[in-house]
């Protein structure tokens, strides 16, 4: 009888293995109904068991059965047992339990996705041994890639195999999603092939031994989060990542780790493999000694939320060449590398051979001798600095002694540059002040109470300058007169539309400067701005409606000097109405006595050419008058003995001309009396004092004049305008003259 019962039991057991129970199938996945009241189902094994589940399986969050929607809440025990051809599995957030041995003998399962979910996922084990080591749920699976979007709950003891991913030696990539709060002890213990781990922003803690023996872990990403991340250790005086040869780190949050003597639990202390570090936006502090001894560290980026970097944070970082402070509004306090009570200290980056720096933060630091003066003091390898748009000040001595520094870009929000900032920056050739609306105050290199001090860039050999700001500074000789004083190699200067004023002495003795364009935004060019600019040959004052106030070079009761006295300007574009002090003590009008000026073009915003403006410019050959000029003052071209080409551009309003010499008792001299004009284009009606005392008319007896074109818009030619122009044999009248004054063309061969 007992033998019959045993045979019956064996037959039933065998049948149960071969033909698992299920209620329905949907899209190749088999289900049993867990609860008809709650409308829940569980994934179960297939009738074919070892062959049904293969390739990629995506478990849906819900299925339709008998016309009703059931939530998938469970993967049953042994559901995928023996499915050796199952390669990829995705488990939805609706699943809250995975039964024991669910993946027994799934020897092909490489890719696992546990989708994001708020509820924990309870997982069983592969086998339980009460007297020896058990096996975790994925023991038989050669997992390579894992997305963990759920909090896992499991028996973590020795008899259950510690953790679901314990000693997964093929696992190379892990991403922990935002649904996870905790990575338990030994979470990835012994994952010898693990190369990259991403930890979600809501993970609050990582337990002890979580990455023990992860000997290939090179990349770690800790995403931004609202709370610090508490991390454990590897035990025996070792930090959590002591076994990991990390090379790349993204740290989006502050880390908290157990306090210790000698920083042994600091996770990155003396991490000699680390090469690249980025601190994310949720981190607030880089602690003391944080990256001390990371001798292979090459590049470091500090997030905008960091407000403090502690002492010795980069001590021994002897390969650190790139440093980036991301743009941020707040002030960032920096510690030191070594404070000394009796000798010169060491600044924070003393050990770092930084070559490239992006500074997006305003820095607060000690300028004391005992703290090494400034964080980048004496950075011998620093070549390039860019200061971002959130920085408002550059403190004293910031780049003192950076002998290799060649280019500096200063953001448009900087309002203050302290003293000695670029002292001994002997390789500095290019400076860019980015566009900014507010004036920028700049300090000096040396104050000298008994002589000329040293300006901010006195130790540099500038070649190129972009000036996007109005600069203010102490103009006294005791402070070096101006930041660019005696920059004798400065050959290229660009002034932007944000500049309102060129202050006193600004380009004093910039003897290599050859051309300059001054935008229409500039309203003042102060005294001695171009003193000693002996190579300046081309000057363009761009169009602007507001008048431009010009200073002078030298005030002297005997004989002053005009603003452009020292220049060698040959070509001038004048797009502005000018205001200036007219008198011999100021040297006269700003463009008078310009001995090399050959060509002048007056733009269409100019209304007035003042008295004496181009007086005594002996080589001036060509002059173009803009269409909006309404008045040309007296003596404007007196002494211009080479002016042969004159153009009055087409304009609607008449143009009033002054005179050259007024003789109250005899024949005066008209405006162009001194000028041997040969070619004339007349696009305007001219008005002038038509009396003997002023020389009758502007071209009266102009015997050099050979060619005249009268534009289409001109209908009136005044009295005696071309009287006695005996060489005028080429006269073109493009329009119709309705009024021709008395003797207008008297003696002109072309008229005859």
Predicted features along the sequence, with ranges:
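Boundary at the C-terminal end of the N-terminal hydrophobic targeting segment
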Residues: 16-23
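Structural signature of tandem-repeat unit edges
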Residues: 36-38, 52-74, 84-97, 107-127, ...
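Sec-dependent N-terminal signal peptides
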Residues: 5-13
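N-terminal secretory signal peptides that target proteins for export/translocation
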Residues: 1-2
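Well-ordered, non-membrane alpha-helical segments in soluble/globular domains
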Residues: 129-132, 234-235, 341-342, 449-451, ...
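Extracellular beta-sheet repeat scaffolds used for adhesion and glycan interaction
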Residues: 259-263, 371, 479, 585-586
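Consensus positions within tandem repeat domains that build extended binding/scaffold surfaces
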Residues: 77-79, 99-102, 135-137, 163-164, ...
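GGW-centered surface loops in extracellular recognition modules
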Residues: 23-49
């Amino acid at each position: 009888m007992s033998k019959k019962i045993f045979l019956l039991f064996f037959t039933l057991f065998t049948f149960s293995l071969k033909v698992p129970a299920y209620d329905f199938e949907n899209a190749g996945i088999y289900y049993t109904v867990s609860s008809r009241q709650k409308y829940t189902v569980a994934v179960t094994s297939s009738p074919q068991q070892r062959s049904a589940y293969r390739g990629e399986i995506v478990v849906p969050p819900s299925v339709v059965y008998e016309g009703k929607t059931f939530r998938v809440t469970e993967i049953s025990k042994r559901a995928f047992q023996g499915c050796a051809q199952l390669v990829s599995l995705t488990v939805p957030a609706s699943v809250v339990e995975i039964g024991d041995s669910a993946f027994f003998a799934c020897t092909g399962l490489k890719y696992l996705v546990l989708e994001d979910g708020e509820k924990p996922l309870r997982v069983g084990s592969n086998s339980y041994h009460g007297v020896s080591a058990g096996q975790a749920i994925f023991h038989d699976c050669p997992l390579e890639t894992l997305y963990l979007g759920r909090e896992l709950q499991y028996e973590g003891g020795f008899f259950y195999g510690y953790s679901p991913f314990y000693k997964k030696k093929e696992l190379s990539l892990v991403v922990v999603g935002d649904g996870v709060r905790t990575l338990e002890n030994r979470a990835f213990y012994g994952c010898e092939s693990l190369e990259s781990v991403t930890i979600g922003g809501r993970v609050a803690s990582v337990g002890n031994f979580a990455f023990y023996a992860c000997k290939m872990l090179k990349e770690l990403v800790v995403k931004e989060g609202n709370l610090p991340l508490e991390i454990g250790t590897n035990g025996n005086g070792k930090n959590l990542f002591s076994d990991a040869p990390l090379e790349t780190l993204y740290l989006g949050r502050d880390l908290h780790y157990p306090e210790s003597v000698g920083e042994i639990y600091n996770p990155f202390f003396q991490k000699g493999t680390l090469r690249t570090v980025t601190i994310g936006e949720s981190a607030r502090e880089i602690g003391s000694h944080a990256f001390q001894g990371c001798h292979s560290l090459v590049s470091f980026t500090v997030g905008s939320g960091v407000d403090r970097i502690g002492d010795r944070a980069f001590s021994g970082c002897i390969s650190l060449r790139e440093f980036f402070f991301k743009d941020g509004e707040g002030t960032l306090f920096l510690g030191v590398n070594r404070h000394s009570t009796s000798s010169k200290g060491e600044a924070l980056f003393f050990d770092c051979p930084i070559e490239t720096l992006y500074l997006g933060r305003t820095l607060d630091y000690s300028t004391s001798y005992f703290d090494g003066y400034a964080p980048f003091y004496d950075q011998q390898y620093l070549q390039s600095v860019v200061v971002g748009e959130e920085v408002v000040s550059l403190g004293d001595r910031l780049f003192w002694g950076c002998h290799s520094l060649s280019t500096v870009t200063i953001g448009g929000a900087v309002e203050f540059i302290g003293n000695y900032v670029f002292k001994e920056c002997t390789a500095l050739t290019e400076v860019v002040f980015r566009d900014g609306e507010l004036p920028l105050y700049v300090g000096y290199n040396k104050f000298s109470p008994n002589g000329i001090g040293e300006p901010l860039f006195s130790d540099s050999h500038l070649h190129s300058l972009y000036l996007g700001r109005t600069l203010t500074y102490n103009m006294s000789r005791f402070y070096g007169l101006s930041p660019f004083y005696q920059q004798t190699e400065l050959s290229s200067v660009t002034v932007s539309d944000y500049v309102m004023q060129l202050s006193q002495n600004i380009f004093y003795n910039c003897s290599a400067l050859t051309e300059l364009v001054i935008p229409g935004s500039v309203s003042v060019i102060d005294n001695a701005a171009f003193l000693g600019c002996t190579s300046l040959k081309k000057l363009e004052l761009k169009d602007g409606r507001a008048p431009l106030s010009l200073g002078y070079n030298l005030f002297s009761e005997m004989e002053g000097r005009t603003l452009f006295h020292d220049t060698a300007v040959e070509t001038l574009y004048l797009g502005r109405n000018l205001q200036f002090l007219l008198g011999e003590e100021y040297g006269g009008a700003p463009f008078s006595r310009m001995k090399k000026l050959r060509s002048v073009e007056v733009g269409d915003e100019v209304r007035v050419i003042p008295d004496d403006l181009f007086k005594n410019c002996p080589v001036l050959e060509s002059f173009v008058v803009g269409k909006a000029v309404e008045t040309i003052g007296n003596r404007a071209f007196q002494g211009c003995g080479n002016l042969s080409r004159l153009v009055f551009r087409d304009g609607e309003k008449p143009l009033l001309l002054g005179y050259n010499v007024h003789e109250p008792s005899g024949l005066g001299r008209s405006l162009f009396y001194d000028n041997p004009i040969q070619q004339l284009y007349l696009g305007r009606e001219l008005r002038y004092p038509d009396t003997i005392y002023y020389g009758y008319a502007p071209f009266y007896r102009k015997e050099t004049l050979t060619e005249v074109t009268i534009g289409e818009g001109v209908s009136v030619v005044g009295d005696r305008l071309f009287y006695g122009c005996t060489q005028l044999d080429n006269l073109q009248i493009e329009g119709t003259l309705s009024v021709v004054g008395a003797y207008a063309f008297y003696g002109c061969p072309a008229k005859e």
